[in-house]
From Swiss-Prot:
PANTHER family: METHYLTETRAHYDROFOLATE:HOMOCYSTEINE METHYLTRANSFERASE RELATED, UROPORPHYRINOGEN DECARBOXYLASE. It is found in: Cytoplasm. Homodimer. Pfam families: URO-D. Substrate binds at R25, Q26, A27, G28, R29, F44, D75, Y146, S201, H314. Pathway: Porphyrin-containing compound metabolism; protoporphyrin-IX biosynthesis; coproporphyrinogen-III from 5-aminolevulinate: step 4/4. Catalyzes the decarboxylation of four acetate groups of uroporphyrinogen-III to yield coproporphyrinogen-III. GO terms for biological process: heme biosynthetic process; protoporphyrinogen IX biosynthetic process. The record marks D75 as: Transition state stabilizer. The gene is hemE. Keywords: Cytoplasm, Decarboxylase, Lyase, Porphyrin biosynthesis. GO terms for cellular component: cytosol. This is Uroporphyrinogen decarboxylase.
Length: 338
């Protein structure tokens, strides 16, 4: 058990003296220390696979920001490589994926091919016993979107057409990806992850009807299987939160990580659920006065006896100022629960 178990106690609904805080993409390009380490390797994927460097990066936010949890440094796309997908990160362009496009050509997932991820979890836990370690994976639909689009997309037209016009192939691919993510997260839990988070970054492009039909059954199965496997807390992050919240609360997730399209204090009035979030990241471009106003404005409205974790509604951006991120973390940590 980590010395600072605020995150775990909050997710379990136990008494806490203050709200726990960590940030998505808390170890990233906005940190000079990260950039120095990044320059020691040729590309981003190599960095993800270098256990020593990835461990060092994972630990940076604890040392520099004093966050209440460490999320391991990795990427949601790495479990696609064992399926036979070529994954590249092109500087200035982001991820590029290539495969035959035939679902039947995908290999059966072998978790051992992502052994470096599990080793990073072990190393981070060996290096510190201060805070919990969070493992993570991309959700099946978000991974499918990358596969069908060949990378990031503005409109996800190809994904939607594949989903609507090839329902049998869509189901086959989603089944494969769901079992892949399940096996991958089970290995992270076995390696010692104290919490796991599932990132559904692209579902905000779907209608409520399509989310219910094409996403919900797979996420529901995935989270249920994880909860049957272990009592390790599960957090589900999904963009477009206001559209899908009524469905997402039915998941067995310990907390839903939501974007700024919803009002968390209001959610606590309606649902008996844990929530994480949801300060709009753009607030960090503003002055410290605005950061304080927006942050305290949220925290003051959160009921004390609730399962709540402070985070952003999405990840930190590369051009954000480290000092403002530190100011935000200190602000949350200094907010007393009375």
């Amino acid at each position: 058990m980590p010395k600072n178990d605020l995150l775990l106690r909050s997710l379990r609904g136990e008494p806490i003296g203050r709200f726990p805080v960590w940030l998505m993409r808390q170890a990233g390009r906005y940190m000079p220390e990260y950039r120095k380490i990044r320059n020691r390797v040729k590309n981003f994927l190599e960095l993800c696979k270098n256990v020593d460097l990835a461990t060092e990066i994972s630990l940076l936010p604890l040392k520099i920001l004093g966050v209440d949890a460490i999320i391991i440094f990795s990427d949601i796309l790495v479990p696609l490589e064992p399926l036979g997908v070529k994954v590249e990160f092109v500087e200035g362009e982001g991820p590029k994926l290539s495969w035959s496009g035939k679902v039947s050509d995908l290999k059966k997932y072998d978790p051992s091919q992502n052994a470096y991820v599990y080793e990073i979890i072990k190393r981070v836990k060996e290096a510190q016993d201060e805070v919990p370690v969070i493992g993570f994976a991309g959700a099946p639909f978000t991974l499918l979107s990358y596969l069908i689009e060949g990378g990031a997309s503005k409109d996800f037209k190809s994904t939607k057409l594949f989903m609507w016009e090839n329902p049998k192939e869509y189901k086959r691919l989603m089944d494969i990806l769901t079992e892949t993510v399940l096996a991958y997260l089970k290995e992270q839990i076995k390696a010692g992850a104290d919490v796991v988070q599932i990132f559904d970054s692209w579902v905000n492009n779907l209608s409520l009807e399509d989310y219910g039909e094409y996403v919900y059954p797979y996420v529901n199965y995935l989270i249920s299987e994880l909860k049957d496997f272990s009592d390790t807390p599960v957090i589900y992050f999904f963009r477009g939160s206001s559209s899908f919240i009524d469905l997402a609360v039915d998941y067995r997730a310990d907390a839903l990580s939501v974007d700024w399209s919803v009002d968390i204090p209001e959610l606590f009035k309606i649902y008996d659920k844990g929530f994480q979030g949801n300060l709009e990241p753009a607030v960090l471009y503003a002055s410290e006065e605005v950061i304080e106003e927006k942050t305290l404005g949220l925290l003051r409205r959160i009921p004390v006896k609730t399962r709540y974790v402070f985070n952003l509604g999405h990840g930190l951006a590369p051009d954000m100022e480290l000092e403002k991120v530190k100011y935000l973390v200190d602000l949350v940590k200094s907010f007393p629960l009375t």
